């Protein structure tokens, strides 16, 4: 199967390169009868859009999304929805210098080994620019899930470098350029990013995504488990190197009687499981964490080779993010929404109704 | 799509419950012409098989696998391969006591919410017993990949509780009951497990899986990336709560110039990426780590409710593993083999050959 | 994707060769809560089973089916259902003579070109023996659809050679060895088959399948249309060379005002469309016709070549059906049931419920 | 899975309605390294394009196709290819009169039953306008197959009404407005169509598609057989009611010794099978026939009901084809190309190379 689709009943297929004519996608499986407009999608596209502060690349992307099909008189028809976002403000010439080089940490080397050639302009298809359509598709899923059963999917920056942010206030998240929920971290984050900018370096981050009001029963064991599909979707985001559900790697040193979530007639007493038991949602909030590596394009020179095997030293400045993890918040929300939407539809299909 | 299949060109579909008549699977997509026998599969099934030491459940499972189709005169024919493993030594009566209870940490609650009922005997389909067929399927993939391009897939215990094991000696891994590569950890692990057994508790673990000689080019961006499919496959293993590729969560506090793997004419100077760049294998060893939670069935009593909402205190002794992570080593190897096999075939299909 | 699966939400995967150890399958996607027993499946297996008359091969196949999983206390659990049918009464030695020959009309040649080798015993995987599991899977779908919304799926022989049978009496269908609904054809059919048997020849047939009480709305345009999926499923039956929906090829010479089915407040005035409009069920009976070629193994000698290219004349007697179309009736019913079941679940998943 | 995709390794996904903003698609799985331009696609789009004669609807569709991604420096990159065709010349107001009516023979009724509403403008998604993208996708597959192994896929009109056309001259096909290969039929066809136009009626047709130089071995039994996938793809074309492979329905009255294709050291002596044995290509030309119903929109009045159940008489003139079968030739060629391309890649993936 082509690698550019995700989901079964709710299926998102995308195309587009960093410096191509446009990015686009087809969203298949949206039930008919839901009000939907381009504005519904633009909200999250704007949250993802860089250029709003010094913390992310100054490259200005006017990501205006167009819905080309699947809507009639303002309502979804149940047919496939075509999405289009034109590319603008491209400085392809910036990339001439790396056309024959493999930028360490980037996909240049592996793409060329796989395809025998590559679109070197801004990383081509391997650029995070591709996530624009993921965010638009996720916005459709978010809206459906909210209308249909009140599911609320939100994310925030949990850590940048050594600075850990606690979930103190959801309202704070949209009020600072870091998607940070912890007002006490803002100054430290500000200093960290300013210093990194000064020295032309970048840093990794941890993002947490939480879905509330998820009904119990979502997930199709033994392979299409909800946690497994979330891991797939989240790991498919550029720069993600790790995924956790609930306590994640902390379970390694936990004892059996510490880890299990006890149950009372009032519900669960804890949520170490992150809302998923045996690959199926339990009705508790679904919690996932992801680790994003630092951008590889920094001012520090490094060693690499050309397509012809010659060793060279390069400095890949470009106009890149100091912390790609920040922009990953709306992207990760979108991927969780896409997975939950798909499983919501699958669960409805398989529900019991025969005696 | 049914949730009991994994893979596209190399597709594994399974059935069977902990205490049903049998476990089985269908392996579709094995290329014709490879010598294959039941013995090839039995090796890994025995490695997974409990009962060989006090560290894992004394339940004796004689997991003899039968190949029912797809082989003619000792060679694969290219048609689907049917596998069967009969269930024996079942003590279903042991589970009468929990037929109306939800065991905390188990899938009892979520399965019943999803399906409206459940096979309570040993967890039914949610039992790790289901992984028997995964291991058999993985053995087929391992053999193909080894023959075809010398890929070698091996795993080991990297941590149990607070005891971290270093990869000092691959040969040591198969010589101790922990799949531990670090002889200096054996005594500590022995004491830890003995104490947990004495107090009837369990503990989590970390398992590392490494695939060597993986050719560059495996992975189908932007969604069926190699890292994303590995995350899906590994997270689908019972008790797994986290997956890392390469440096994983350590990247959060790394700087851009630390994380990227520099390249020379002799190859990469490091492997922070875990052998995957942009979702495509780079030719370096593919490295993944998983976190497994402690078994939830321990002697410490805990609170739960019945199907009817009544609160009760239970002790779910049964005959369970002290550290399920140990048995997860051959299972995780199998899942990585299944994913690499699928991507090896997919990559071959898409290779360039037109000018 | 492996070629041995069909369906998305209701997914049937099979294995097994004509003379292998066993045939089996995995049925994934059966909703939980339906009473199901091996007897429910055996009924159709017996209808398909040869040996009940001279009209079909004397080979006695005792197709006892075993359900190995997915049922608990007599009810489906929503997990995958494993099926097994053992092979018996094999006369593999009968096939030694053709191990190096390509039987014209059989798949010997194409299988060997594809796989580089073949299991020559009774055609191996290409044998109609494989349809045993399709019939068992179809029986599950039939039962679900009948319970869930009263859908009734039945087939009959519409033509053998030049003898056309009219649908005069459904009850007659199960009372003669031809699945013929037209009592006035029985004698002619009897004579035809006896003569063919005498001269060791075979004949083609046409089978009609009708599903009643199919709710309007099944089918997922523009590719997974109900008619397209039926065409796929029916054409996948051994020896089928043509598929029609409704009037089929008769539409070629129809005028626009003849073909369209007019509508009144009482419903449609005709059913030229065969119950499908724009790829979606209209609520009228779904009608399909298939053409089956005559068995290629007959007493008349014919020319062929060996694997080594040598020309030879062969007579492939074996113990084969005079009219394979007869046995195809329950198989075609099963394939229609599998498709309708899949689309019933898919339609439920996509139904509108948001404003 | 969403119903708007077809194929596994070569996957075509489409969107767009008759009177929406645009039609588009994503072609996933095109191997890298093939030269490809918009002109390569435009050729077939023009062949499909109406308005070139009185025989087809005067509606002028300027189907200029844009490739938005997947090509770099004139060559495919192996990433997904985005296609876009803008809609123009729309007379939506023409359809106001039928907004509350179900046009007999059209999908109005079934779409509304399924989705609870419909885009009534020109049939919305159910319009044959949707096939524009299929033709563009097919053109990519045709080019690849021609370059890669000389496969040549061509179609022609085999029958309109009672007028049967013989394959006398391939060159003639592109030289008349009927795609007719039989110069002796042209006058009769001309008179037939002129009369139908005069009386405002329409007629059915039969189209034959032949693929030459298809290598032996394409097809994945037992369900994803080449013939089964062709039946699926061809039956998914608007107005198609029947599909035949090789002799098709003629096999019903054939004897076993007539139907089988004998083999000599020079190859097969006949091609009753249509180039497919056991669901796998035999190396002979692959031959398929399809039956297309007459357009339902004609000047003759007919009975129908409104959405509210009121009986009315309608005349759905519009600007429609007298024989939709004519335009179906390039569409059917495209669908066969899409299926062969997918199976070519799948076969390459599964080929034997291990001992």
UniProtKB/Swiss-Prot annotation, chains A, B, C, D:
In the UniProt record, does the keyword Secreted occur? no
Q: Which GO terms describe its biological process?
A: amino acid biosynthetic process; aromatic amino acid family biosynthetic process; chorismate biosynthetic process
InterPro entries, from UniProt?
Chorismate_synth, Chorismate_synth_AroC_sf, Chorismate_synthase_CS
Which protein family is it in? Belongs to the chorismate synthase family.
Q: What is the reaction catalyzed?
A: 5-O-(1-carboxyvinyl)-3-phosphoshikimate = chorismate + phosphate
The record's annotation in Pfam families points to:
Chorismate_synt
Query: Which molecular function terms from Gene Ontology are attached?
Result: chorismate synthase activity; FMN binding
Q: Which residues bind FMN?
A: 125-127, 238-239, 278, 293-297, 319
Asked whether the keyword Lyase is assigned, the reply is yes
Which function does this protein serve?
This reaction introduces a second double bond into the aromatic ring system.
Pathways involved: Metabolic intermediate biosynthesis; chorismate biosynthesis; chorismate from D-erythrose 4-phosphate and phosphoenolpyruvate: step 7/7
Going by the UniProt record, its keywords in alphabetical order are: Amino-acid biosynthesis, Aromatic amino acid biosynthesis, FAD, Flavoprotein, FMN, Lyase, NADP
Can you quote the record's cofactor note? Answer: Reduced FMN (FMNH(2)).
Residue positions annotated to bind NADP(+) are 48
The record's note on quaternary structure and interaction partners says: Homotetramer.
Signal sequence range: none
Q: What is its EC number?
A: 4.2.3.5
Q: What PANTHER family does the record point to?
A: CHORISMATE SYNTHASE
Q: What is the protein's given name?
A: Chorismate synthase
As cofactor, the record names: FMNH2
Instruction: List cellular component terms (GO).
Output: cytosol
């Amino acid at each position: 199967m082509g690698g550019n689709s995700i989901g079964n009943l709710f299926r998102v297929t995308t195309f587009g390169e960093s410096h191509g004519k446009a990015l686009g996608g087809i969203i298949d499986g949206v039930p008919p009868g839901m009000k939907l407009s381009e504005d519904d999608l633009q909200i999250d596209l704007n949250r993802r859009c860089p250029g709003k502060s010094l913390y992310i690349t100054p490259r200005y992307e006017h990501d205006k999304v167009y819905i080309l099909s699947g809507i009639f008189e303002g309502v979804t028809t149940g047919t496939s929805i075509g999405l289009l976002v034109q590319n603008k403000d491209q400085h392809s010439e910036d990339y001439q210098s790396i056309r024959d080089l493999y930028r360490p940490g980037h996909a240049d080397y592996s793409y060329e080994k796989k395809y025998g050639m590559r679109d070197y302009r801004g990383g081509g298809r391997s650029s995070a620019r591709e996530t624009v359509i993921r965010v638009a598709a996720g916005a459709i899923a978010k809206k459906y899930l909210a209308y249909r059963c009140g599911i609320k999917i939100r994310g925030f920056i949990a850590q940048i470098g050594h600075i850990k942010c606690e979930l103190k206030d959801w309202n704070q998240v949209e009020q600072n350029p870091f998607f940070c929920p912890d007002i006490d971290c803002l100054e430290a984050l500000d200093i960290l990013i300013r210093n990194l900018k000064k020295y032309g370096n970048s840093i990794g981050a941890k993002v947490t995504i939480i879905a509330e009001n998820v009904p119990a029963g979502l997930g199709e064991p033994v392979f299409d488990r909800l946690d497994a599909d979330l891991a797939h979707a989240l790991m498919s985001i550029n720069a993600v190197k790790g995924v956790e559900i609930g306590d994640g790697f902390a379970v390694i040193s936990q004892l059996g009687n510490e880890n299990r979530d006890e149950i009372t007639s009032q519900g669960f007493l804890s949520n170490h499981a992150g809302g998923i038991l045996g690959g199926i949602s339990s009705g508790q909030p679904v919690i996932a964490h992801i680790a994003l590596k630092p951008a590889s394009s920094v001012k520090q020179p490094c060693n690499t080779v050309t397509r012809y095997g010659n060793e060279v030293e390069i400095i890949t400045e470009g106009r890149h993010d100091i912390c790609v993890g920040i922009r990953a918040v709306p992207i990760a929300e979108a991927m969780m929404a896409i997975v939950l939407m798909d499983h919501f539809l699958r669960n409805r299909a398989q529900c019991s109704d025969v005696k």
